[in-house]
Amino acid sequence: VEEYKKSKQKRVPKIDSHLHPDMTFANFIVGNSNRMAQNAALLVSTKPGMNFNPLFLYSHPGLGKTHLLNAIGNKAKETNPNLLVRYITSKDFVDEIINSIKTNTTDEIYSYYRNLDILLIDDIQFLFGKEKSSEMFFHIFNEIINNNHQIVITSDKMPDELQGIEERLISRFKSGLSFGIDPPEFETAKAILEKKIENLGNTDLIITDDVLDFMVMNYCNDIRSLEGQLKRLFFCSIMESTNYIDMNF
């Protein structure tokens, strides 16, 4: 590991990682539903390309895949700022490939990606039916793996359930480590909600326990929806000029 780190110290990053700085391991709430995925993500962030490559994380939307992808990148950059890391959605990847074809810069795009230390690609299912983009990704994937660099992929389905993506890519996804993320159990969802309230920055806001429990029971299957309901409550509290929210609000 030390030799790996030293070999990177001389390199100067020349790219924007496109990471969300607020998505870290420190503010990722861990429970039984996501513990294995979080442990694997933390491991590859500190030892990229060493053993578990690619890492494939899957779940329904809104359960933390994007957060973990960014946490990997942020932790890796914190450990070694010279690492070349890129977070990108598969939709944006497709757009980049299309643009490179139009501008005759596919060689530059290929060189750019193959030299990354860590590629974090979100929602790989949207490569469905994109022949040229899939071809480019296949070759980039092979180069990164062969260079002992790290790829982390997320999807709304496990590899075997992906439709419209070439079998050779599916086979490579399955060659690494895969973990699913389940909807959070009640305690984890409530802890996530409490963290979201803390992040609002309004220390005077009081939301009673029965309101929190009601929100969790109705929206725990989708953390984004849970967060959306919290923001709605926060907005309404501002409109009503109150910092106290109970079931009568």
Feature map (PLM): residue ranges:
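Structural recognition of the conserved hydrophobic beta-strand(s) that form the central parallel beta-sheet
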Residues: Y87-I88, L120-D122, Q150-D156
